[in-house]
Amino acid sequence: MTGSSPSAGPLQMKDKFTDSGKLIFLCAYAIKKSFLQETIMANQSVTPADIFADLLRFRAPAAIAWVRGGDAAPNLSGLVKFYQTPYGGVLVEAEIFNLPNKQVPGSTDFYAMHIHQNGDCSDDFAKTGDHYNPSGKPHPDHAGDLLPLLGNEGYAWLSFYDKRFSTDDIIGRSVVIHSHADDFTSQPAGNSGTKIGCGVIEKADYLKV
């Protein structure tokens, strides 16, 4: 199948509609009811996947991170959302635009994504600190070691369930995207290369659902 990858990033939407970009861009999450909610009492075979799909389609995230590129990838932008689930863990959804392989037709490259200790994306992301690792475990068992992004001609979308942290644990920290894949072996950070994108994780309590 051929076709061009998505190119309009969420930061463009953020800048266009409001100063904060939050209310209008995310207003689709202010839906009170979903088909799943209306039928869940009658259907006892609802799976976690059904719940997760409902969260992504109809619910407001508990926290978000607007991701922007640094000197190495100035056009990179994206949005990472964190949903607290009824199972104790967090559903993570990431959508990233203009990854470095955007200019290579048909290219697919992996990019490491981690939660870092500090919520400071200044100075070309030099102040984000180490991976979020409250239990002091070796890499890749840090609570902040997330699944890698698969960039398809510069665009990546990813969603996964993670029970190593809650949304309250990570608010005020940062999501960092790296120039290379995480090898899940090298210490202390998986030999993931340069930091090319960063976003501070903030509470999304301005959304009323």
Model-derived features: where do they sit?
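N-terminal amphipathic/hydrophobic targeting modules at extreme N-termini
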Residues: G9, K16-F17, K22-F25
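Hydrophobic alpha-helical membrane context
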Residues: P10-L11, A126
